[in-house]
């Protein structure tokens, strides 16, 4: 299974495979048609409190990563996502979509690390 991340505002591509939005909130100004999302897994997104605390501040990213990973460990929605990805098959590509402008310091990057570390 190949897992990638991509800004939801970038154009959809057949190379994206299964497109999964991992934001709790729908991306501003983006129609459902243009987003071309297969699945919206908002329950695996960081809690509202953690998202607000982080505020996409790169200086807080290491702490954010640790706190978000802890949330994921305690979140039953992550198991559903892992199972879904597993059932897609090893040859399928999955693209985790996020709305943040920072392509490095965001929840999708942490979620990808988490899923990769669990061999999904």
Regions picked out by a protein language model, each given a short descriptive name:
Residues 1-120:
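Residues lining hydrophobic/aromatic ligand-binding pockets adjacent to catalytic sites
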């Amino acid at each position: 299974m190949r897992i990638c991340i991509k800004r939801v505002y970038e154009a959809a591509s057949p190379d994206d495979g299964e497109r999964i939005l991992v934001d709790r909130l729908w991306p501003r100004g983006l129609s459902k048609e243009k987003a071309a999302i297969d699945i919206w897994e908002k329950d695996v997104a960081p809690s509202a409190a953690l998202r607000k605390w982080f505020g996409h501040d790169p200086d807080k990213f290491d702490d954010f990563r640790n706190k978000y990973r802890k949330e994921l460990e305690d979140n039953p929605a992550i198991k559903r996502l892992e199972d879904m990805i597993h059932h897609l098959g090893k040859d399928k590509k999955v693209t985790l979509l996020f709305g943040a402008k920072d392509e490095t310091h965001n929840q999708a990057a942490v979620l990808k690390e988490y899923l990769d570390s669990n061999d999904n």
